[in-house]
Amino acid sequence: MSTLGHQYDNSLVSNAFGFLRLPMNFQPYDSDADWVITGVPFDMATSGRAGGRHGPAAIRQVSTNLAWEHNRFPWNFDMRERLNVVDCGDLVYAFGDAREMSEKLQAHAEKLLAAGKRMLTFGGDHFVTLPLLRAHAKHFGKMALVHFDAHTDTYANGCEFDHGTMFYTAPKEGLIDPNHSVQIGIRTEFDKDNGFTVLDACQVNDRSVDDVIAQVKQIVGDMPVYLTFDIDCLDPAFAPGTGTPVIGGLTSDRAIKLVRGLKDLNIVGMDVVEVAPAYDQSEITALAAATLALEMLYIQAAKKGE
């Protein structure tokens, strides 16, 4: 099957099923798309249960449950009438070669950004965010990070490819500014001296959504923002299908409201990662991820309609 980059893809996990039944475009660089969806079926950097490579396919498949609603509640307009969104399928790389994946994903992102496109990416494990940050920083300069997760992923363990080290590496490479970055939903140990503002799950669950969003806006300011959502930010009651679930997380309702509240930020790139459908129940994790991805597109469409 010829897919992204006109490469022959014999992968057992890549998927050419368009998100929301959106049109597939395997050469999105020359398209008139505003936003391009890319799947990255990669889970070699996981430290927990593997299976995130099947995440993009699961998100796309369950998104058919969302495609029917045109004037989506509570937005009351059709995102597809304001944004031109295409799905370019999955990144093709030699399975087992983490370096090739990283280099190809960064090159793909750089080419899209140079063509004036914006990216919504489906992982895969969370390591895929690092090559995306490298590409976005080349185009937009140093960015703020808004990061939803149960873990800070700022661990300095010396591994080059590890889904728990990206946000230790990214500041050192000058890709993001921790002083203007926020990590939301954290409920595992972390280094309190890394510069990031951490809004742990306890306080995010206890505070009002408006209060949390006001603090995020104050910290981020007018910097370009990269938005990354690890599905294990949600409590396992709402997202069991992930590699490293942690009890005590956000509800899907609260997460959606928080994402909607980010509408006024200068978001330049977005991803949803760490869906591992082998551990899912009734596709609820994939549905949560697909819904959050759709809400991310809606906050972009809402700005375009203003």
From Swiss-Prot:
Query: Which positions bind Mn(2+)?
Result: H126, D149, H151, D153, D230, D232
EC number(s) given by UniProt? 3.5.3.11
> A GO term (biological process) for this protein?
spermidine biosynthetic process
Identify the domain of life: Bacteria
Query: Pathway, per UniProt?
Result: Amine and polyamine biosynthesis; putrescine biosynthesis via agmatine pathway; putrescine from agmatine: step 1/1
Please list the reactions this protein catalyses. Answer: agmatine + H2O = urea + putrescine
Q: Which InterPro entries match?
A: Agmatinase, Agmatinase-rel, Ureohydrolase, Ureohydrolase_dom_sf, Ureohydrolase_Mn_BS
This entry's Gene Ontology molecular function terms read: agmatinase activity; manganese ion binding
| Keywords, in A-Z order | Hydrolase, Manganese, Metal-binding, Polyamine biosynthesis, Putrescine biosynthesis, Spermidine biosynthesis
| Coiled-coil ranges per UniProt | none
SUPFAM superfamilies noted in UniProt: Arginase/deacetylase (SSF52768)
| Cofactor(s) named in the record | Mn(2+)
Q: Which family does it belong to?
A: Belongs to the arginase family. Agmatinase subfamily.
Function comment: Catalyzes the formation of putrescine from agmatine.
The molecule here is called: Agmatinase
Q: Which organism is it from?
A: Shigella sonnei (strain Ss046)
Q: What gene name is given for the protein in this entry?
A: speB
